């Protein structure tokens, strides 16, 4: 049986410390995408989501493990198919994860 999820991307903000020094996503917005089958998620699809939001190039792609107590220890980089498999497992277990893309600012 297929498991469907809604990808959630954080855009327009930045990762930085709050007043207590805890790393948070600051001043961004949340963008959701159409429902996808977890088994069909792949790196090119995740790259396509970033491009559709105006981020044609990025330096790193991350997902936030939903059970993490903070972003400093909860961000997981996506580089390989194995990383995507860990993402899929978390999506099935938790129903949702947030995606973050490191990118250069266009000036």
Segments (PLM) and residue ranges:
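Phospho-regulated scaffold assembly regions enriched in serine/threonine/proline and acidic residues
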Residues: 1-107
């Amino acid at each position: 049986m297929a498991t469907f999820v809604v990808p959630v991307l954080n855009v327009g903000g930045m990762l930085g410390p709050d007043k207590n020094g805890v790393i948070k996503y600051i001043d961004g917005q949340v963008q959701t995408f159409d429902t996808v089958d977890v088994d069909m998620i792949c790196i090119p699809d995740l790259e396509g989501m970033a491009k559709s939001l105006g981020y044609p190039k990025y330096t790193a792609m991350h997902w936030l493990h939903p059970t993490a107590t903070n972003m400093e220890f909860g961000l997981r980089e996506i580089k390989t198919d194995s990383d995507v498999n860990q993402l899929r497992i978390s999506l099935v277990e938790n129903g949702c994860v947030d995606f973050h893309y490191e990118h250069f600012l266009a000036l």
